[in-house]
């Protein structure tokens, strides 16, 4: 025999006073993050909130640059969210990392494809995973390092995006080692030239202006030099 429905009076229903603010912050977070699957993302959001973990929330809205059907779905903003959630650990368990990836509504097959670049068993060094994610965002090694600087920097958005040269050189060597077209001698020569340029004026830090030169600027410089030659 089914049990009768339990009835509660208004005095028995306790609504925590902080609930309106929680829902307000949740709504703002959803608007900024624009998750592809709201239910999946919401589960990850409130799970992290209940544990006191960093939330899967972007710092700001992003213009979409890819679709999950044709590309990774990964964006600089989402990769930065993962970094906020994982950077306090030197190594991250793959099961935990995959769940965080899933909570950001990123395709599982792309997670596996990323790990195939540098296979591991149960865990991965976080800085290595971050480097692989940056390489997935950028077509070239320098573009990947640009994304790395923008994610790791303490400078305000739009600033020089400086990070320690030690971190930069580690990631550059790591990614270059995965690229069969880049020799170790080329890597070391390039890093040595960068270090020489920044040692006297950057206090061990490297920023975008030290290594990243957009194609547009290169073309303008080339045109200017040709004009001078004429």
From Swiss-Prot:
The keyword Ubl conjugation is assigned to this record: yes
Coiled-coil residue windows: none
One example of a Gene Ontology biological process annotation: regulation of protein phosphorylation
Subcellular location: Cell projection, Cilium, Flagellum; Cell projection, Cilium
Keywords associated with the record: Cell projection, Cilium, Flagellum, Ubl conjugation
Main location: other
Ranges where the RIIa domain occurs: 17-54
Classification via InterPro entries: ROP_DD
GO cellular component: motile cilium; radial spoke
SUPFAM superfamilies with a match to the protein in the record: Dimerization-anchoring domain of cAMP-dependent PK regulatory subunit (SSF47391)
PTM comment, free text: Sumoylated, sumoylation decreases upon spermatozoa capacitation conditions.
Cited function: Functions as part of axonemal radial spoke complexes that play an important part in the motility of sperm and cilia. Important for male fertility. With ROPN1, involved in fibrous sheath integrity and sperm motility, plays a role in PKA-dependent signaling processes required for spermatozoa capacitation.
UniProt similarity note: Belongs to the ropporin family.
Subunit structure: Component of the axonemal radial spoke complex 1 (RS1), at least composed of spoke head proteins RSPH1, RSPH3, RSPH9 and the cilia-specific component RSPH4A or sperm-specific component RSPH6A, spoke stalk proteins RSPH14, DNAJB13, DYDC1, ROPN1L and NME5, and the anchor protein IQUB. May interact with AKAP3. Interacts with FSCB; the interaction increases upon spermatozoa capacitation conditions. Interacts with CFAP61.
PANTHER family reported for this sequence: ROPPORIN-1-LIKE PROTEIN (PTHR14952:SF14)
Identification of the protein by name: Ropporin-1-like protein
